[in-house]
Amino acid sequence: MTSDQIKQLDANYIAQTYAKFDLALSHGQGCEVWDFDGNKYLDFTSGIGVNSLGWADPDWLEAVIAQLHKLSHTSNLFYTEPSARLAKHLVQVSGLKRVFFANSGAEANEGAIKVARKYSHDKYGDTRSTIISLVNSFHGRTISTLAATGQKLFHQHFFPFTAGFEHLIANDLNAFKTRIAQNDICAIILEVVQGEGGVCSLDQAYLQAVQGLCQVQDILLIIDEVQTGIGRTGTMFAYQQFELKPDIVTLAKGLAGGLPIGAFLLADKVAETLAKGDHGSTFGANPVSCAAANAVLTKLEPLFLTEVMRKGQKLRKALQSLPHVKSISGLGLMIGVEFDEHINVADVVTNCLKQGVLFLTAKTKLRMLPPLIINDEQLERGVTVLAQVLSEM
């Protein structure tokens, strides 16, 4: 089948909800992918931060194939080894107490919202149900996670949303202090680096002050690590770089290295909030996805994470010297590049694609989420192509 035939089938039969690259992918290996016409591309997207180990990692493939030969699905009515092992591993690396497995980041955030509401209801009754999130945040596309998302762009056409969500300006501590004085807040959900919002890191002083206020007023701190988690920023979780101790952490994207999975981790304080029957998922804790996630976590040893941090610093340094670059944001291998105002980021991405390198956007910024295994030569190649494209604009 040719690229044009695939695109036509897509146009005819798939709901047209995505602004796709003009590219039909056939296969991948490491940090490179090929289209159906035989063209090769260097990948700085990793499926929007999902393919942590790149494409077709041999150990990942071995784990997935072995599990497919045993159990592909069981439901959560039965115990399975992959989910039990994965839960233990996540608890050990996070310091939290329990894990619930879902299928996506939105599902993980929905679950975290339910935990926060139930914790508050059990302890305080019906008077503390409001959840604060931040302007410019992104937490998912379900009705409740859209309500939590602090971007009006995503709110069009879908009212009414789930009640009980309010958005505050990030890094404005006085606004947070003023709002929580009403004593009706059960939780705050935030990303320490706002990915879809433009790869914007929050201030450490703000985050630590918010955490302190939450502890005083028994407000749950939910950290959305859907995009930042599982080594993306150079530590297992981005919150670890800000010296935070969240009550709930949500995960997805890179956790299973390319298969659907979501999870929320619960600290001791809320570990027993959900009782049997309070929450569930038919496909959650899928044995194949959990086996894949175990393969990913096995690779993320301290030296591997140190290399992610080093490569991120190397990439940032190289980007600083490029023409039209105004600022660079992010942590580790989650990087945003802001250009001079006359540069159209969509044109940059399109022209880089024509030169064989795939990048993403985040609002007006170029976004880089390469596989964590990317090597120095590939980083340099990507920067060289970007420099060439920018020099011609």
From Swiss-Prot:
Q: Which UniProt keywords apply?
A: Amino-acid biosynthesis, Aminotransferase, Arginine biosynthesis, Cytoplasm, Pyridoxal phosphate, Transferase
- Which gene is the coding source of this polypeptide chain? argD
Q: How is the cofactor bound?
A: Binds 1 pyridoxal phosphate per subunit.
Write out the similarity annotation.
Answer: Belongs to the class-III pyridoxal-phosphate-dependent aminotransferase family. ArgD subfamily.
Q: In this chain, where does the modification N6-(pyridoxal phosphate)lysine occur?
A: K253
The cofactor required is: pyridoxal 5'-phosphate
> From its record, what is one biological process in GO terms?
L-arginine biosynthetic process
Q: Would I find Cytoplasm among this entry's keywords?
A: yes
Q: Detail which positions bind pyridoxal 5'-phosphate.
A: G105, A106, F138, D224, E225, V226, Q227, T282
Q: What is this protein called?
A: Acetylornithine aminotransferase
Give binding positions for N(2)-acetyl-L-ornithine.
R141, S281
One further remark on this entry is: May also have succinyldiaminopimelate aminotransferase activity, thus carrying out the corresponding step in lysine biosynthesis.
Tell me the enzyme class: transferase
* Pathway linked to the protein: Amino-acid biosynthesis; L-arginine biosynthesis; N(2)-acetyl-L-ornithine from L-glutamate: step 4/4
This entry's Gene Ontology molecular function terms read: identical protein binding; N2-acetyl-L-ornithine:2-oxoglutarate 5-aminotransferase activity; pyridoxal phosphate binding
InterPro entries from the UniProt entry: AcOrn/SuccOrn_fam, Aminotrans_3, Aminotrans_3_PPA_site, Class-III_PLP-dep_AT, PyrdxlP-dep_Trfase, PyrdxlP-dep_Trfase_major, PyrdxlP-dep_Trfase_small
What is this enzyme's EC?
2.6.1.11
NCBIfam families documented for this protein:
argD (TIGR00707), PRK01278.1 (NF002325)
Compartment annotation: Cytoplasm
Catalytic activity, as annotated: N(2)-acetyl-L-ornithine + 2-oxoglutarate = N-acetyl-L-glutamate 5-semialdehyde + L-glutamate
Q: Write down any Gene Ontology CC term.
A: cytoplasm
Q: Note the subunit structure.
A: Homodimer.
